[in-house]
Amino acid sequence: MKQIIKNIYYIGDNGCSVYLVDTQSDQGLLLIDAGMDLNMIKQIDSHGMKLKNIQHCIITHCHIDHIGICAELKRELPNIQFYGHALDAVPIEESGHDDRTAASWYGVIHEPVKLYQKFTSDTVLKLGSYDFQCIHTPGHTPGSISVLVESEGKKVLFGQDLHGPFNEGFLSNLQDYQMSMQKLLDLQADILCEGHFGIFQPASQVRQYIETHKHQNQTQFI
């Protein structure tokens, strides 16, 4: 676990990169995705935080490497609230969508979990003094979202899986992806926390990463 900027942390990577924000309020801690290993998240207890203080989790999209332990996390923390986009809600909340969740890729079974809030448009989630801009960025999946939040005057973008991949089983759409990437470029983020390939800063590196994948993924379907 390491601090990225004040109150924003990288917990680790198991399935995907999992990030945490300390709202410094009675709203407690917020996760960006959950990954596939609850023990990895439990390690925050040894870094001066408490698992029991995790109250929120924003699910960036419906893939198993990002939501694999959500049901387990709900049993551990019954009051945790999950957020996601309505267009990815069915495979998150129901079983039997192994292509949509990519569970078939991993040879696992998805255990459904209910969303507390389903976004239908760009939405600001206010927790403590933080405004989490939940931005609809379809392409990788129909309900993919990216999250923008400010800390110490820096724009921090959680852009999970901006690299893809794109697959018919995921209901990917490359035209949507191109528009989504332009939307993210227009945000002019200072820090990018990606889902699998690390943390990019300053703003010039964020722009380069997004532009590179935007260019590469014009026709790249698998």
Model-derived features: positions:
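Conserved beta-strand hairpin/beta-sheet module of binuclear metal-dependent hydrolase folds
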Residues: M1-H47, S146-L162
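Short Pro/Gly-enriched beta-strand edge/turn motifs at strand-loop
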Residues: M1-K6, A103-G107, G128-F132
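Short Gly/Pro-enriched turn/cap motifs at secondary-structure boundaries
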Residues: Y9-I11, K114-Y116, H136-H140
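Short catalytic-loop micro-motif centered on adjacent basic/acidic residues
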Residues: L29-D33, H56-I58, C134-H136
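Residue-level marker for buried hydrophobic side chains located in beta-strands
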Residues: L30, I58, F82, V156-F158, ...
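Metallo-beta-lactamase
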Residues: D37, V124, Y130-K214, F221
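Active-site HxH/HxHxD metal-binding segment of metal-dependent hydrolases
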Residues: D37-I41, D45-T123
